[in-house]
């Protein structure tokens, strides 16, 4: 039974061939092929990012433009472009924020919860990734909506899937 659940999760989260990109630790970000330190955002920027995450989550990436984000965040367009430079960069940052939060939850479930049986951990992981109001939904939505229009941001979503697959592989080897 556990192998069936695991196989189902791997099928669900496996990237297509040729898109594999392994990350050695869960908290590293990559931008233009270079390693970046952990994402640290000022308070006002974080407010804009959280507002954009909410808008993208409920309306989609293509229906929400810079004008709507600026209006909802109550900042000027100049401030927006000073913070993010482009909508693609904002989407990429939003996905990085969601990815890091999700990775923290997965690591907490898998590595630190030693009293829970493996099958229950898999069920929790499944529930975490199928919750439409959860952290994974934006990453999942990005896979289908932004592949052609925002390829750098798309790679962020794909790196999470690759990380999750690697995490399962390492967990099985132990």
Feature locations, PLM:
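Helix-turn-helix
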Residues: 47, 55-89, 93
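Hydrophobic alpha-helical connector segments
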Residues: 93, 107-135
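Amphipathic alpha-helical segments used for helix-helix packing
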Residues: 132-158
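Generic hydrophobic, amphipathic alpha-helix propensity
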Residues: 44-53, 69, 94-98, 102, ...
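N-terminal intrinsically disordered/low-complexity leader segments
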Residues: 1-43
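Amphipathic alpha-helical packing segments from all-alpha helical-bundle domains
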Residues: 100, 106-107, 152-174
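Short, structured helix-loop boundary elements
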Residues: 45-46, 66, 88, 92, ...
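Solvent-exposed, amphipathic alpha-helical segments
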Residues: 51-58, 105-109
């Amino acid at each position: 039974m556990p192998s069936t659940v695991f196989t189902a999760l791997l099928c669900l989260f496996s990237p297509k061939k040729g898109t594999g990109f392994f990350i050695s630790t869960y908290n590293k970000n990559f931008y233009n092929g270079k390693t970046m330190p952990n994402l640290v955002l000022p308070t006002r920027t974080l407010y804009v990012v959280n507002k954009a995450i909410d808008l993208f989550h409920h309306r989609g990436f293509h229906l929400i433009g810079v004008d709507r984000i600026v209006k909802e965040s109550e900042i000027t367009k100049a401030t927006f472009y000073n913070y993010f430079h482009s909508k693609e960069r904002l989407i990429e940052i939003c996905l990085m924020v969601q990815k890091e939060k999700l990775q923290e939850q997965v690591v907490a479930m898998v590595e630190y919860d030693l009293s829970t049986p493996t099958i229950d951990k898999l069920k929790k992981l499944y529930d975490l990734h199928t919750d439409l109001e959860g952290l994974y939904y934006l990453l999942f939505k990005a896979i289908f909506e932004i592949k052609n229009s925002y390829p750098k941001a798309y790679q962020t979503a794909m790196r999470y899937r690759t990380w999750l697959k690697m995490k399962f592989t390492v967990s099985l080897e132990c």
